[in-house]
Design a protein with these regions (language model features):
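Charged DNA-binding/catalytic regions of mobile-element recombinases
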Residues: 1-154
Length: 154
């Protein structure tokens, strides 16, 4: 499992928008949630609300998560919300080497795909006024990505 934070852009009247992405490197199933900050609690939220329930529904378990050393993922293990959450869930946390984004290449490629196939296209056609509107469109794209795109790609 790979996780990362991606800066999507800025919405007028809202501010900066970040995408918390999670990718199962084996199945290539992806999850994404948009937030106006990149805090540890948002990283926990996407795991707790979307990823772990998906695995539980499929009677599977997440054993390891790979992230960069961003402040939203790393800190003192006894105080950092993300680190504490992973400990409580029994998930091992591995980090990439500094300045080596290719170490987390699966998620970097997902970001490129999301940018090319979703954000750039929708951004030209749709005037978003809220993160919720953006999330609705992202959810539709991720549904396509997870169910249709890989069937054709093989």
């Amino acid at each position: 499992m790979a996780v990362d934070t991606f800066f999507v852009g800025a919405l007028k009247g809202v501010g900066k928008v970040y995408l918390q992405t999670v990718l199962d490197c084996y199945s290539r199933h992806a999850w994404g949630r948009l937030y106006t900050s990149k805090l540890p609690i948002t990283s926990v939220h996407v795991l707790n609300e979307a990823v772990l329930p998906f695995f539980e529904a499929h009677e599977a378990q997440v054993y390891t998560i790979l992230s960069d050393k961003g402040r939203e993922f790393c800190g003192r293990p006894d105080h950092h919300p993300y680190e504490l959450f992973l400990q409580l869930e029994g998930i091992e946390h591995r980090t990439t080497k500094v300045r080596r984004p290719q170490s987390n290449g699966f998620i970097e490629r997902l970001h490129r795909t999301l940018l090319d196939e979703h954000f750039r296209i929708k951004g030209r056609r749709t005037w978003y006024e809220s993160v919720e509107q953006m999330q609705t469109d992202l959810d539709s794209y991720l549904e396509h990505y997870n169910t249709q795109r890989h069937i054709r790609a093989g």
